[in-house]
Amino acid sequence: MQAINYDIDYDAEANKVGLIIGIPEEIYFCSISKVSTVYVEYINNSWVAWRESYVPNTNQRTSYKLITQGNFELVIARVKSYLTYIKRNKG
């Protein structure tokens, strides 16, 4: 049996779900409201996704929610589901 070797284009996959590239292959983000942002970042050999909310017109964080952590495919799939859920409940 031969090993399958494939490379993931992290930036392209993140763009497909609506994330903006902060630092290529390291951090991505998406604003979901005037006061909330979703982040995806590669930290300590693992991908982590979370949402932060802020006090309007300040940098002071009011809440933090861990969405998921794990390999890139898992995190992107969960972020896609989370963003779909948020968009569905906004409208």
Report the location of each language-model feature.
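Short aromatic-glycine-(Arg/Gly/Cys) micro-motifs in beta-strand/loop hairpins
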Residues: 34-64
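Non-membrane alpha-helical secondary structure
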Residues: 6-9, 67-71
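Negatively charged, low-complexity tracts enriched in Asp/Glu with abundant Ser/Thr
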Residues: 1-34, 58-61
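A short, charged, amphipathic alpha-helix used as a generic interaction element across diverse proteins
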Residues: 59-61, 68-87
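Short intrinsically disordered terminal tails
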Residues: 1-3, 84-91
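Hydrophobic beta-strand residues in large extracellular and virion-surface proteins
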Residues: 19, 29, 38-40, 47-50, ...
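Short, flexible coil/linker elements and helix-boundary hinge sites characteristic
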Residues: 16-18, 22, 45, 87-90
